[in-house]
From Swiss-Prot:
Induction profile: Highly up-regulated during growth on PET film.
Species of provenance: Piscinibacter sakaiensis (Ideonella sakaiensis)
Lineage: Bacteria, Pseudomonadati, Pseudomonadota, Betaproteobacteria, Burkholderiales
Misc. remarks from the entry: The calcium ion is located far from the active site and appears to have a role in stabilization of the lid domain.
Protein name: Mono(2-hydroxyethyl) terephthalate hydrolase
Keyword flag Disulfide bond: yes
Region (Disordered): 24-44
Range of residues in the leader sequence: 1-17
Length: 603
């Protein structure tokens, strides 16, 4: 039974922010489907005074880091549900900063945090992951991802978030590529890589114990993209901090992914039409929306039925990687070759386009042919058409919007490219933002990749050391009962889903029986964290809690399409399956209904 704290007056807040190359399948112990979460244990009565006592100068709160300053400790009223957010309970909000200092670049730095503790607490602690290169403190209502309206706070978890140790509004240097300029300061790099999450977790747990009179029973972390990397990092560096972790689309070796960004830019350049103001090929003009959709349809024509059902989803993504080649594929609309035999038309791709996309998708190599990052998956989510609207999720990273007169793809001139130069290259390479696309075009794949392994002066850790989360030694996390769910969209253009699958296979080889504590769910058609022609909506928190607290491993996770118009239907649900299984049609019933599919080995 929950204990309601009737003396609390609390204020509203809004919600903020194919398999891999290995061959070691992981056995999947069979479990019963997850049940509803058990009622939380009773918590001690708290009060307005207990909340306000967390403010500096009140009470005798001892923080794990003495350099902790509380700036807000206030009651917040319950907030009603809206179209985009679940109702929030009354709660105590505490926000502050840890380790205020001045960096070697002359800019001020601090590790900001925001904590929310509900009046009716379920005894659980929750941290939400960041995004991009962080630098923004979210509302900290505990986003659980998967397109969910519910948040951890709405489910009565105590929730916390951090900005990662720098502030995009403060640490914005236009001469050092803007908001990624924190990379000029060595400590800010370490804070963003791992230190801030350790510091904020400790602070949050201490405040929770003080406020409620006892420690949390279990602790959970959910993040996607950079937040997914943070989750993997926590399981490796700080295995005792969290009992359950969800790591979505993890940029666990993001510095390498940045190298891939330069590779895709240079690979696509020969197909570009026109130049930008700096004389750089307009990568966004290399494929029109219709061209990219034609490629997506050709992938479906080759791969859709490889799972036993032609339904607009490539479930057998492993077989697809071996089967599809744009140079030999057909346009399913007319049965003619996808690659133009003569002049370019609306029904085919030019030989230059085909060569460009094949080179880009194969992944970067140096002059000796050594891979520098992973390959990318051929998947229908590279485009998609809902009504008359083309999916932009994939192209926004590699190409940018077709109608733009400037290069605006994340990997060409956006934060993905900029962060590599200032945050991950050592020493950092500050420059005006107008020069980024040209720098990507001049990237040397023999020399520049060495910079993610380099140290220099006060930069005593390489970016792969402070930011990478590549370890497969999760013994400490496993041995204390930790559980981790990884997920990744097959059409993610930020980080390769095949790279995450390769990590999972390495984990299985290093730790036999890894499926007993870690499982990977690949999502066909989904783009980066969400979107695309796939079932991109799901709740990972409920099955995670069931696994951690009741030992019920997730043998499948229910998912549904956020944009069923991609399939020309009103709704579509499917099971997400633990790698290496895929969703297979049972042979009868509505193909848009999850119950008519089962998780099984690919055909």
């Amino acid at each position: 039974m929950q204990t309601t704290v009737t003396t609390m007056l609390l204020a509203s807040v809004a919600l903020a922010a194919c398999a891999g190359g290995g061959s070691t399948p992981l056995p999947l112990p069979q479990q019963q489907p997850p049940q509803q979460e058990p009622p939380p244990p009773p918590v001690p009565l708290a009060s307005r005074a207990a909340c306000e006592a967390l403010k500096d100068g009140n009470g005798d709160m001892v923080w794990p880091n003495a350099a902790t300053v509380v700036e807000v400790a206030a009651w917040r009223d319950a907030a009603p549900a809206t179209a985009s957010a679940a109702a929030l309970p009354e709660h105590c909000e505490v926000s502050g900063a840890i380790a205020k200092r001045t960096g070697i670049d002359g800019y001020p730095y601090e590790i900001k945090f925001r904590l929310r503790m509900p009046a009716e607490w379920n005894g659980r602690f929750f941290m939400e992951g960041g995004s991009g290169t962080n630098g923004s403190l979210s509302a900290a209502t505990g986003s659980i991802g998967g397109g969910q309206i519910a948040s951890a706070l709405s489910r009565n978890f105590a929730t916390i978030a951090t900005d990662g140790g720098h502030d995009n509004a403060v640490n914005d240097n236009p001469d050092a590529l803007g908001t990624v300029a924190f990379g000029l300061d060595p400590q800010a790099r370490l804070d963003m890589g791992y230190n801030s999450y350790d510091q904020v977790t400790q602070a949050g747990k201490a405040a929770v114990a003080r406020f409620y009179g006892r420690a949390a029973d279990k602790s959970y972390f959910i993040g996607c993209s950079e937040g997914g990397r943070e989750g993997m990092m926590l399981s490796q560096r700080f295995p005792s901090h969290y009992d359950g972790i969800v790591a979505g689309a993890p940029g666990y070796q993001l510095p390498k992914a940045g190298i891939s960004g330069a590779w895709t830019t240079q690979s696509l350049a020969p197909a570009a039409v026109g130049l930008d103001a700096q004389g750089v090929p307009l990568i966004n003009k290399s494929f029109s929306d219709a061209d990219l959709h034609l490629l997506s349809q050709a992938i479906l024509g080759t791969c859709d039925a490889l799972d036993g059902l032609a339904d607009g989803i490539v479930d057998n993504y492993r077989a697809c990687q071996a089967a599809f080649d744009p140079a030999t594929a057909a346009n399913p609309a007319n049965g003619q070759a996808l690659q133009c035999v003569g002049a370019k038309t609306a029904d085919c791709l030019s030989p230059v386009q085909v060569t460009a996309i094949k080179r880009a998708m194969a992944g970067p190599v140096n002059s000796a042919g050594t891979p520098l990052y992973n390959r990318w998956a051929w998947d229908a989510g590279m485009s998609g058409l809902s009504g008359t609207t083309y999916n932009q999720g994939w192209r926004s990273w590699w190409l940018g919007s077709f109608n733009s007169s400037a290069n605006n793809a994340q990997r060409v001139s956006g934060f993905s490219a900029r962060s590599w130069l200032v945050d991950f290259a050592t020493p950092p390479e500050p420059m005006p933002m107008t020069q980024v696309a040209a720098r990507m075009m001049k990237f040397d794949f023999d020399i520049d990749p060495l910079k993610i392994w380099a140290t220099s002066g006060q930069f005593t850790q390489s970016s792969m050391d402070w930011h990478g989360a590549t370890s497969t030694d999760l013994a400490a996390f496993r041995d204390r009962g930790g559980k981790m769910i990884l997920y990744h969209g097959m059409s993610d253009a930020a980080f390769s889903a095949l790279d995450t699958a390769d990590y999972y296979e390495r984990l299985g080889a290093a730790m036999p029986g890894a499926a007993g504590f870690a499982r990977l769910f690949l999502v066909p058609g989904m783009n980066h964290c969400s979107g695309g022609p796939g079932t991109d909506r799901f709740d990972m928190l409920t099955p995670l809690v069931a696994w951690v607290e009741r030992g019920e491993a997730p043998d499948q996770i229910s998912a549904w399409s956020g944009t069923p118009g991609y399939f020309g239907v009103a709704a579509r649900t499917r099971p997400l399956c633990p790698y290496p299984q895929i969703a297979r049609y049972k042979g009868s019933g509505d193909i848009n209904t999850e119950a008519n599919f089962a998780c099984a080995a690919p055909p």
